[in-house]
């Protein structure tokens, strides 16, 4: 008989203590003890997007291996909002890569109510500046529709580790020159 070691979890959202098998991920814990969080200043609820585990931000795939104090967070929390926006960026990146395999999405900088993004050709103009692709209204609608489909399919995000060399090769093959330059600036490439 195999005995699973139990760990203690304190959920700050409801002030309750729980026991879970060691290695249980935060999504499973959230589903059982705190499936949604109440927004501050209102009674509206939002999905759990991440968690503060002993006051450190963790994604929902994080596996709890020891006793922790956990606070599940949603969109109303600054870290929850950043998690949500970053997730949308990954979805948009995948959709652009799918619809325009010969182009690159560049998420350039933050604006007060969003992010400034450009779809660029992989090749630069003669003066070295990036050549921007301007999507039509129909193309934007197609991008939005595909993003919705991808989100509704509820595919998980999978984090992988790669060597710096493999990462640079990947960025080079996708025409992401800024990321290649950033990686090279770390000085760890031969």
Regions flagged by a language model, labelled:
Residues 1-89, 94-96, 100-112, 122, ...:
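Ubiquitin-like/PB1-type beta-grasp interaction modules and other compact soluble beta-rich domains
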Residues 111, 123-190:
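Non-catalytic interaction/regulatory segments
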Residues 118-120:
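Short hydrophobic/aromatic beta-strand micro-patches
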């Amino acid at each position: 008989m195999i005995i699973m070691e139990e760990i203690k979890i304190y959920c700050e959202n409801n002030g309750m203590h729980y026991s879970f098998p060691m290695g249980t991920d935060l999504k499973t814990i959230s589903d059982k003890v705190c499936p949604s969080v109440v927004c501050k200043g209102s009674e509206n609820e939002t999905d759990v997007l991440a968690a503060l585990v002993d006051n450190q931000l963790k994604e929902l795939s994080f596996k709890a291996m020891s006793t922790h104090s956990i606070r599940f967070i949603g969109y109303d929390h600054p870290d929850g909002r950043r998690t949500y926006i970053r997730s949308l960026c990954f979805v948009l990146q995948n959709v652009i890569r799918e619809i325009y395999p010969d182009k690159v999405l560049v998420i350039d900088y933050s604006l007060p109510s969003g992010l400034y993004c450009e779809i660029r050709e992989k090749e630069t103009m003669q003066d070295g500046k990036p050549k921007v692709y301007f999507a039509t209204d129909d193309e934007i609608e197609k991008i939005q529709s595909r993003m919705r489909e991808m989100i509704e399919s509820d595919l998980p995000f999978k984090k992988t580790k790669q060597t710096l060399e493999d990462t640079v090769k990947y960025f080079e093959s996708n025409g992401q020159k800024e990321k290649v330059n950033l990686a090279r600036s770390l000085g760890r490439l031969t």
